[in-house]
Amino acid sequence: MRWLFWASPPQNDSHDASPNAHPRPIKPQRREAHQDHTPAPGQAAPEPTISNAQSSRDWNSSLNATDWKQFTEPKTIIPTALLTGGILLCVHIHRKYLRRIPEAGYISPSYFRRRSLLGKVTSVGDGDNFRLYHTPGGRLGGWEWLRKVPTGKNELRNRTIHIRLAGIDAPELPHFGRPAQPYSHEAHTWLTNYLLNRRVRAFLYRPDQYGRVVATVYVRRWLLFKQDVGLQMLKQGWATVYEAKTGVEFGGAELERKYRDAEAWAKRRGLGLWEGLKGKKKEKWESPREFKTRMAAEEAQRK
């Protein structure tokens, strides 16, 4: 039955009863997420797609990758070698020349007869020995303007080197129960005025049985002229040449000759302790070595 012309058309043409009506084709929905990407036989496989997360990882890994070749290039090797060598050189210089030695027991055997110590005299104990505060590098090492030398007894305790002047023997002050030898105070006073609070250089020879270091010592008194302290004591007549069967140390045959000539010169003029050889005093005069020998014999008899 035909619809009247004023009637509304049918809701769905697919329900048209006309036998000649053809059904409208239905378009398939796109479901890309569920499509099977398996290639057909004879067909090439599609290229995989790169996600954003994977591309980010590749970019970060390329940034963090280490290029080991750059460490073998001259522009890297040369500065590194120079820096390392400079550091090792500074450490070597500090250990060999700028390290302070607190006491005689810390002196390496390699120093004896090869090295010298620069320091300041803090006290004079006798006519032939004193205490030295080691100041490595001197003024170039900052001493006296950046680094101060201690002055108090507590500050200097266990921090000074006991030096024994080589090649000479001065009159003994009273100690160990022994009386003072004639001219001992005069010799001690002269050496104190000559050395105390002055910078000296000591050329080390060996340690002695009392924990001291036997050394030839030089001091600058006038301008740039350095003077041998032991030689000056001999010239002034406040010491004699060291005489003993063993343990005699002069620092060489040349120094020994100078010392003996200086002693003979002062003896002829009757300077210092040699004044006792004049007139009636000659019978009572004895050298520092003779005094020590007599004291040792008397102590042995008392035992």
Curated annotation (Swiss-Prot):
Residues 115-276 form the TNase-like domain. InterPro entries: SNase_OB-fold_sf, Staphylococal_nuclease_OB-fold. Residues 49-59 have a biased composition (Polar residues). Its EC number is 3.1.-.-. One of its GO terms (cellular component) is membrane. It is an enzyme of class 3 (hydrolase). The active site is at R164, E172, R212. Its main location: mitochondrion. GO terms for molecular function: endonuclease activity; metal ion binding. It comes from Uncinocarpus reesii (strain UAMH 1704). It holds the Pfam family SNase. It is a single-pass membrane protein. The keyword Nucleus does not apply. This is Probable endonuclease LCL3. It is found in: Mitochondrion; Membrane.
